Every structure is written in structure tokens, then in C-alpha cells.
Amino acid sequence: MKKIVLATGNQGKVREMADLLADFGFDVVAQSEFNVSEVAETGTTFIENAIIKARHAAKETGLAAIADDSGLEVDFLQGAPGIYSARYAGEKASDQENLEKLLTAMEGVPEAQRTARFHCVLVLMRHENDPTPIVCHGKWEGRILTQAHGDNGFGYDPIFFVPEDNCASAELEPVRKKQLSHRGKALKQLFATLREQPLV
């Protein structure tokens, strides 16, 4: 199997990607197994940050690398929290603190103006200097609820309303969430690309 490094410290993401990429003959290894140092996400877009993370992991391990950058874009807040979704309430903020800050920012905003979407950009770099990395973008439309619902998922899932299923993202079963979510859509694109252009 061909080793590929996943540029994340999130073990949940590592397990999910390992299962999905095994079908393509990949052995997914977390960057933590190589003691890859943290890299500053200095980009101003999801794409830039995903490329920064993938390039850094490829450089430090000598392997092909996959990175994702994702976040929530709220129209009423001119796109915030955006690339700062994980640290919206501060550098070391918890999911709960980020969620509460967003609910406060959206207090009193009418339902019609609560539109939002999750974005996920996945980047696969064959090596550190790959001039044409594979870039896949998934988007999930919904709106911001006025209070949290459900216990599944993480991040902003409890306050993200999913019109297709008339519930919060945190109320979806994991299999259903994968079908609808921004990350699920980006992964589908990645797999379609890998079928057409297998990594050698």
C-alpha cells in the first residue's frame, strides 16, 4: 500500500480518511506519527491554508500529503467566522465557546437572514513542490438556528440547520451526515479525481 500523510492532529479525521482511502490502496498515516511541527495558517482563504498544511506535511515527511481546511460562512456576518471558525472566540477557544459567540452575534436576526454554509477544501500534494495539487471543494447550505440541538458531530453542528432533513446537523446519523456534508462532497470529488488520475 502507498503511504500518504494526513496533515491533521484530529484522530477522528484520520480514522475516517483511512477507511475511505484504503479502497484506493492508500495507507493513511497521521502527521503526528512523524512528529511534524505545527505550521502557521497564514492564508486568507480555505484553499491557501489547506495548501500550506499539505505542503508542510509533504516537506517534513517526504510523502504525498492530504490536508483539509474547513469552516462556516454566515451571510449576515459578511462571511464570518470563515477561516477563523475553529478560533472564532479566541486562539484556544472550545467548540462550545465558538458556538456561543456565534449565537450571540446572531441574536435577534430574522430567519430569512440566517443563511450560512459550511466549506471544506481538500488538497492532495504528491510532493512538497507539486505544481498542480489536487484541490477539491465541498459546500453545504443551511442556516443558523437560535439554539443548539442534538449530540452528534462537533463544532457548529448543533446550530446548523439542514433543510433537506429539517433538523440540526448534530441530529443527523453519521452515515447521513457524510452524504450531505461539505467534507463528504469534497471527498467524493477527490475519489473521482483519483479514479481518473491515480497517484503513481
UniProtKB/Swiss-Prot annotation:
Reaction catalysed by this enzyme: XTP + H2O = XMP + diphosphate + H(+); dITP + H2O = dIMP + diphosphate + H(+); ITP + H2O = IMP + diphosphate + H(+)
Its EC number(s): 3.6.1.66
Transmembrane segments: none
Binding of Mg(2+), residues: D69
Enzyme class, broadest EC rank: hydrolase
Active site positions: D69
Residues given in the record as substrate binding sites: T8, G9, N10, Q11, G12, K13, S70, F154, G155, Y156, D157, K177, H182, R183
Gene3D superfamilies: 3.90.950.10
InterPro entries attached to this UniProt entry: dITP/XTP_pyrophosphatase (IPR020922), ITPase-like_fam (IPR029001), RdgB/HAM1 (IPR002637)
Cofactor binding annotation: Binds 1 Mg(2+) ion per subunit.
Keyword vocabulary terms for this entry: Hydrolase, Magnesium, Metal-binding, Nucleotide metabolism, Nucleotide-binding
NCBIfam families hit by this protein: PRK14822.1, RdgB/HAM1 family non-canonical purine NTP pyrophosphatase
Cross-referenced PANTHER family: INOSINE TRIPHOSPHATE PYROPHOSPHATASE (PTHR11067:SF9), INOSINE TRIPHOSPHATE PYROPHOSPHATASE/HAM1 PROTEIN (PTHR11067)
Function: Pyrophosphatase that catalyzes the hydrolysis of nucleoside triphosphates to their monophosphate derivatives, with a high preference for the non-canonical purine nucleotides XTP (xanthosine triphosphate), dITP (deoxyinosine triphosphate) and ITP. Seems to function as a house-cleaning enzyme that removes non-canonical purine nucleotides from the nucleotide pool, thus preventing their incorporation into DNA/RNA and avoiding chromosomal lesions.
Sequence similarity: Belongs to the HAM1 NTPase family.
Full protein name: dITP/XTP pyrophosphatase
Organism from which the protein derives: Vibrio vulnificus (strain YJ016)
